[in-house]
Amino acid sequence: MANLRKTHPLLKIANDALVDLPTPSNISAWWNFGSLLGLCLISQILTGLFLAMHYTSDISTAFSSVAHICRDVNYGWLIRNLHANGASFFFICLYLHIARGLYYGSYLYKETWNIGVVLFLLVMMTAFVGYVLPWGQMSFWGATVITNLLSAVPYVGNSLVQWIWGGFSVDNATLTRFFAFHFLFPFVVAGATMLHLLFLHETGSNNPVGLNSDADKIPFHPYFSYKDLLGFIIMLTALTMLALFYPNLLGDPDNFTPANPMVTPPHIKPEWYFLFAYAILRSIPNKLGGVLALLSSILVLMVVPILHTSKQRGLTFRPASQLLFWILVADMLVLTWIGGMPVEHPYIIIGQVASVLYFSLFLVLNPLVGWLENKVMNW
């Protein structure tokens, strides 16, 4: 008789995704980040749910409700620290997952890649509205600055901003709707993740050499289920250590001050995982131009498959393109550093050079070097 796990309509879906999935035998630890992102999403939804049970989305009580969670709710401090630092781990895994895709040419699975970019944007939106909820100084001013960027949209900009605010400034209506969005979006992300996996399983996973691996596939379980489990243990250990020993390491001290529309903090900046995009935004001395650059810094990922010129898929055997990849990594780190610095000399020019290099790498240098490597192979 056939196994229930292979015949039951529901179990069959789980089986095809997690048990009997044919997987390339040579995928490395860089392929662990997809499942780690799934774990991040689940842990964020769970900790977020417990926080939402005690949080109030009203400007008069939001800040004190977060303090109440940390002081008076059983293990509330732990749940809050896991949730806040879980966001950082979410983005660390995201950036490493995207970097893996860029390095090994996984972006040639176009549907999977584009849904991934949409997922990235959704997670960024979720993190942004979530950062506003504690209603500290940086929450309030971050919300003010970032929502204000929409006023750069020609003709409808100002109406758009006031529509999102629900008034003429960031106020109670804004906080209430941001809480609603922050509760909703993770479930949208979970739905989009299902699509991401659906399209991935149409083609199967890529692998480090970028060749067809049909001749050498192994079942996902037990091999990769245990490999993923090891990744889970490492990440959860790191997250727990950060949440218990250094819970405020990545936060902004300004957010321990309740929001005050009358006092502007000396340096308004987002959480560390948005600093690279913030640096690109600030490097253009024009509002609309900055907003377009900010959007393009993420959407440029969508044109990567179109601009792939090499005959080889990944960078495993392409040293010149590898050099460009690591320059991109260094450039991202420089942009992250600049995003947290004040707008003054020499940071302005460093940010502008790094921003130009960022787009040049994606749009000009990588396609050019891929084309040159083809020439060298023929020669």
Swiss-Prot record:
Family assignment from sequence similarity: Belongs to the cytochrome b family.
Topological type in the membrane: Multi-pass membrane protein
Subcellular localization(s) per the UniProt record: Mitochondrion inner membrane
Cross-referenced SUPFAM superfamilies: a domain/subunit of cytochrome bc1 complex (Ubiquinol-cytochrome c reductase), Transmembrane di-heme cytochromes
Cofactor note: Binds 2 heme b groups non-covalently.
Gene Ontology CC: mitochondrial inner membrane; respiratory chain complex III
GO MF: metal ion binding; ubiquinol-cytochrome-c reductase activity
Subunit composition and interactions: The cytochrome bc1 complex contains 3 respiratory subunits (MT-CYB, CYC1 and UQCRFS1), 2 core proteins (UQCRC1 and UQCRC2) and probably 6 low-molecular weight proteins.
Annotated transmembrane regions: 33-53, 77-98, 113-133, 178-198, 226-246, 288-308, 320-340, 347-367
UniProt: heme b b562 binding residues: 83, 182
GO biological process: mitochondrial electron transport, ubiquinol to cytochrome c
Keyword Lipoprotein: no
Keyword hit for Nucleotide-binding: no
Binding-site residues, a ubiquinone: 201
Residues given in the record as heme b b566 binding sites: 97, 196
Cofactor(s) listed: heme b
Keywords tagged on the record: Electron transport, Heme, Iron, Membrane, Metal-binding, Mitochondrion, Mitochondrion inner membrane, Respiratory chain, Transmembrane, Transmembrane helix, Transport, Ubiquinone
Function: Component of the ubiquinol-cytochrome c reductase complex (complex III or cytochrome b-c1 complex) that is part of the mitochondrial respiratory chain. The b-c1 complex mediates electron transfer from ubiquinol to cytochrome c. Contributes to the generation of a proton gradient across the mitochondrial membrane that is then used for ATP synthesis.
Protein name: Cytochrome b
Note: Heme 1 (or BL or b562) is low-potential and absorbs at about 562 nm, and heme 2 (or BH or b566) is high-potential and absorbs at about 566 nm.
Primary localisation category: mitochondrion
